[in-house]
Amino acid sequence: LANVVGAVHAAVSAEVQDRGGAVGAFVGDGVLGVFGLPTAHDDDPERALGAARAILHRVEQINSTLGVRFGVSIAARIGINTGEAIIGNNGGDIFFDYTGLGDTVNTAARLEGINKYLDTRICISGSTHDQCPSILTREVGDVILKGKKDLVQTLEPLAENHRGAEW
């Protein structure tokens, strides 16, 4: 299992970094990808969606090779939220932990978690959808996420409008 998780971590890291993002943390088999760090781009939400699509493809490849070899399968689930976050060293003087904190990051993590209940692989928030006009989506609904008082608009990306490419 460690070999497969390691391969997934490497693939996710590469896809995030190839699109101008950074890896903020590895937590178990999960990865926090942050866009707008170290350099912000006007299209960071679209870059995150592109990375998500590529990550799903890479995980399928890993499952068909290493997964078969070791008898395991990784189910990739991705949550994307757009907004401001606190970025910096959250580890103190002894342990360096350069990552993102705050409601934006927490909401993305909660969106990742609800995929298994919604039978989706990528969930995005309304704030991400608003920044990605070229992406066709399916409205999943307004949901109450753990730790949130207000409903969060949740959507599933389906395709890019201008190309009709399938997700």
What is each of the regions a protein language model found here?
Residues H9, S13, L56-N63, E84, ...:
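Structural signal for well-ordered, non-membrane alpha-helices
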Residues A85-I87, A108, I114-W167:
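Cytosolic regulatory/linker segments at or just downstream of nucleotide-handling modules
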Residues G33-V34, V72-G88:
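A short glycine-enriched loop-to-beta-strand structural element that forms part of the catalytic core
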Residues D18-V27, R58-G79, K116, V143, ...:
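Catalytic core regions of nucleotide second-messenger enzymes
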